[in-house]
């Protein structure tokens, strides 16, 4: 067995009455843990290689804490706490970044993103949806939907209320980790698996999906859909939209470059280069016909928006007299044609 792992984490989670995992919380996930640490934990867990989620007991947690005292003080301290747990424990060891095969593995990779250990598209999430059970997220934690009605009745009979915040496959990120240096006005609008860079502010209308996020700093008042990554210094205006890779965006990875502004209620279905501006209310899809204007506001040619994907210093606007979508640049007609030719 190799002592090299892609990732390792010790977690505490929730299971339904059949013992199936509903969710897992990893306080201190590790990316590329040291060979010494792997060698210390493998015999205690009976790990012999591959990608595995191994349930372990409180007694094993204490053993692991002892084994790691001289190797990794932070992990040893965590395991000392886990040894006192009244909830089920699991160690997830990933030898490689491969397609997912269990719920604890899926939760570990979502944690890696939200802990900023990997960036969106930096880890394989293939097969994630069937492994994330649809769960009632309540003020008493994750509840299996088949067990919810009974628990609601039990709570009422005690004079209590079991409040259901959402019914979803993904929990909110802040119940698992709050990254340093961020503001999130409505935490329910950021899913676990979002990457929120330092200096990011997400206002009430902002939303960030899993495997998506921001480099930071930046202001998010619109929707950052699955797979979308927003560069530093960019501003997404109120109610604006970025087309995700899950619905409508196909396999095109939509990216927002640095220093961009997407106006209120605008939207993009193409990747933006640096310092692009999209006028409020204008939605650009890949097939949108665009009048390309040069530095003198002269028409150079009519192109599809996808031909302008990734180009820098563009202003997308709608002509209020004739409704045509225009792209204004600071370049000459010759420079524009060269840029388009290079892009193709």
From Swiss-Prot:
SUPFAM superfamilies: Trimeric LpxA-like enzymes. This is 2,3,4,5-tetrahydropyridine-2,6-dicarboxylate N-succinyltransferase. Its EC number is 2.3.1.117. It catalyses: (S)-2,3,4,5-tetrahydrodipicolinate + succinyl-CoA + H2O = (S)-2-succinylamino-6-oxoheptanedioate + CoA. It comes from Pseudomonas putida (strain ATCC 47054 / DSM 6125 / CFBP 8728 / NCIMB 11950 / KT2440). The gene is dapD. Homotrimer. CDD domains: LbH_THP_succinylT_putative. InterPro entries: DapD_gammaproteobac, Hexapep, THDPS_M, THDPS_M_sf, Trimer_LpxA-like_sf, Type2_DapD.
């Amino acid at each position: 067995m190799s002592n090299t792992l892609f990732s390792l984490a010790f977690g505490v989670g929730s299971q339904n009455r059949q013992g199936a995992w509903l969710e897992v919380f990893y306080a201190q996930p590790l990316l590329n843990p040291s060979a010494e640490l792997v060698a210390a934990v493998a015999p205690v867990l009976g790990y012999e290689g591959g990608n595995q989620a191994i349930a372990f007991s409180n007694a094993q947690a204490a053993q692991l804490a002892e084994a790691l005292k001289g190797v990794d003080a932070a992990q040893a301290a965590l395991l000392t706490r886990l040894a006192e747990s009244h909830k089920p424990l699991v160690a997830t060891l990933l030898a490689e970044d491969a397609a997912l095969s269990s719920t604890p593995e899926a939760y570990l990779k979502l944690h890696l993103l939200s802990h900023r250990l990997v960036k969106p598209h930096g880890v394989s999430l293939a097969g994630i949806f069937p492994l994330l059970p649809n769960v009632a997220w309540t003020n008493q934690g994750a509840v299996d939907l088949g067990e919810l009605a009974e628990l609601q009745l039990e709570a009422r009979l005690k004079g209590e209320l079991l409040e259901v915040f959402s019914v979803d496959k993904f929990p909110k990120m802040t119940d698992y980790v709050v990254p340093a240096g961020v503001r999130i006005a409505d935490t329910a609008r950021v899913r676990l698996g979002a990457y929120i860079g330092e200096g990011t502010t997400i206002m009430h209308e902002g939303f960030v999906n899993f495997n998506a996020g921001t480099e930071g700093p930046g202001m998010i008042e619109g929707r950052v859909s699955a797979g979308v990554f927003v560069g530093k210094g960019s501003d997404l205006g109120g109610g604006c939209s970025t087309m995700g890779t899950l619905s409508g965006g196909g396999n095109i990875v939509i990216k927002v470059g640095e220093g961009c502004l997407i106006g209120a209620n605008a939207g993009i279905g193409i990747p933006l280069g640096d310092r692009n501006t999209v006028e409020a209310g204008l939605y650009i899809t890949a097939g949108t016909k665009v009048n390309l204007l040069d530095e003198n506001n002269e028409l150079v040619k009519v192109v599809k928006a996808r031909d302008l994907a990734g180009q820098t210093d563009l202003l997308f606007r709608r002509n209020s007299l004739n409704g045509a979508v225009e792209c204004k640049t600071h370049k000459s007609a010759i420079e524009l044609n060269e840029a388009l030719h290079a892009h193709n």
